[in-house]
Structures are given as C-alpha cells and as structure tokens.
C-alpha cells in the first residue's frame, strides 16, 4: 500500500462500544442501574433469598425503566452476571423548541443538537415551555443509555 492512498472512515458516535457491561448480580445495589427485559432501569429494591436445596442464592430486583417509568422485576442467581447499562447525563443549553416537539440544544463545543424530542413527563414539559417562553436561560440534563436519550431535568441559570 502506497503512502498516497487516503482512507476515509465514517465516524460513528458510539465507536462500537458496548451499551452494557457485566456485573455479578449479588453486587448490584439499590439506586444502581440494571438491564431488565432489554431496558435500562434504576434499581429501587433488592432482596436476596438464601441458597436452597437446589442451587444458588437468588437476587430479586425491582426496578423502574429510566425512560418510560415502567416497573420491571427480575430474579437472577446471585453468582451470575447481569447486564448493567452505561448511563450518561449531559447538560445542554436550550436554544429553541420547534412546533413539532423537537428541541435545539447547544453542546459544550458550540455545535447544536437537534434530534431530541421534549420529554414525556408533562410537568417537566410545562416547566421547559414556561421557562423558555418567559425568556429564561435554561439548561436541560439529557440522560442517555443503550442508544436512547431523553431530557430528564431542567435548571434555570438566570435571565438571558
């Protein structure tokens, strides 16, 4: 291969990184995260049963889906691995809200992010719209996990 050849690679945002990582079920704690039925969840309750006649101690997880708020449960042997989602929270400045429910956000490097909808939480949507319409300088927190993103919090950083 000669030096004059150039190779162009398409950039992918996640660079092929795994959306989850394994963790032993017995070490997952309340307020941690877990994947149940292929959904990223926050653990609200963990209970363990003792080893029985046939096998392992078991962990019973009760968790809430971090994007749609649904309650999910799972029972896993405590010595087995379960999937834990990579959950990230990023703050963006709100620039605009479009008629069709999408938001324009300003990233830390000065670019705009236009692919996010308003959240499903009605009270949060009302706070965002009210603050935006009254000209406040708003910063939204976007939570992302397993290829999904959603606005989960709002901060007023003062008047524009």
Swiss-Prot record:
Tell me which Gene Ontology terms the entry assigns under biological process.
positive regulation of translational elongation; positive regulation of translational termination; translational elongation
Cite the post-translational modification comment: Lys-53 undergoes hypusination, a unique post-translational modification that consists in the addition of a butylamino group from spermidine to lysine side chain, leading to the formation of the unusual amino acid hypusine. eIF-5As are the only known proteins to undergo this modification, which is essential for their function.
* Gene3D superfamilies reported in the protein's UniProt record: 2.30.30.30, Nucleic acid-binding proteins
What CDD domains does this protein's entry cite? S1_eIF5A
Ordered alphabetically, the record's keywords are: Hypusine, Initiation factor, Protein biosynthesis
Where on the tree of life does the source sit, at the highest rank? Eukaryota
Which parts of the sequence carry Hypusine? 53
* One Pfam family hit: eIF-5a
Q: Where is the composition biased (Basic and acidic residues)?
A: 1-13
Disordered: annotated span: 1-22
What is a GO molecular function of this protein? ribosome binding
Q: What does the function comment of this entry state?
A: Translation factor that promotes translation elongation and termination, particularly upon ribosome stalling at specific amino acid sequence contexts. Binds between the exit (E) and peptidyl (P) site of the ribosome and promotes rescue of stalled ribosome: specifically required for efficient translation of polyproline-containing peptides as well as other motifs that stall the ribosome. Acts as a ribosome quality control (RQC) cofactor by joining the RQC complex to facilitate peptidyl transfer during CAT tailing step.
| Family recorded in the similarity comment | Belongs to the eIF-5A family.
This chain belongs to the protein called: Eukaryotic translation initiation factor 5A
- Provide the species name: Zea mays (Maize)
